[in-house]
């Protein structure tokens, strides 16, 4: 699963670069409504009305961002499909790729933007199906667990033990 780890790391960098651009693009609109707010501070979020008042491109960018997030999941699923021979391997590969991508994403945001300030800094975690917010630590824990579960599944399968999507069946 080295390919999943390498893909996850590279994709994490790519996503962090895109978010760097998005933050630079959105910052003037945020400053319009929240002057003096530090650039790394994401909250409070702009309302739809504020985004529309900031210019016609702002709501369009939000729609593009939701599409980017959907494409991210499709890409992670597709790369897992490319290396898997069965549904269990697909789930394991997806978990490894997703977890690696998410952790790499936050690591590269720290390198590129010096953000987050800590693992307890709140973030917009995902926009689909509705905005999810929480401390950065939450997706890091979930992602580390996904990587561990995926690796355990593959190890058990390689030993010839019967597994069902990460559950060992003795």
Regions found by a protein language model. Give the residues of each.
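Glycine- and acidic-residue-rich phosphate-binding/metal-coordinating active-site segment common to enzymes
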Residues: 112-140, 144
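Extracytosolic (periplasmic/ER-lumenal) interhelical loops and adjacent juxtamembrane/interface segments
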Residues: 20-62, 66, 118-131
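Transmembrane alpha-helix/helix-exit interface in multi-pass inner-membrane proteins
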Residues: 12-24, 99-117
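Alpha-helical membrane segments in multi-pass integral membrane proteins
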Residues: 138-146, 161-170
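Interfacial segments of alpha-helical transmembrane regions
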Residues: 1-7, 83-100, 159-169
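Membrane-helix exit/interface motif
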Residues: 72-86, 108-115, 152
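Small-residue packing motifs within transmembrane alpha-helices
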Residues: 4, 8, 12, 95, ...
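Hydrophobic cores of alpha-helical transmembrane segments in multi-pass inner/ER membrane proteins
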Residues: 72-79, 134-152
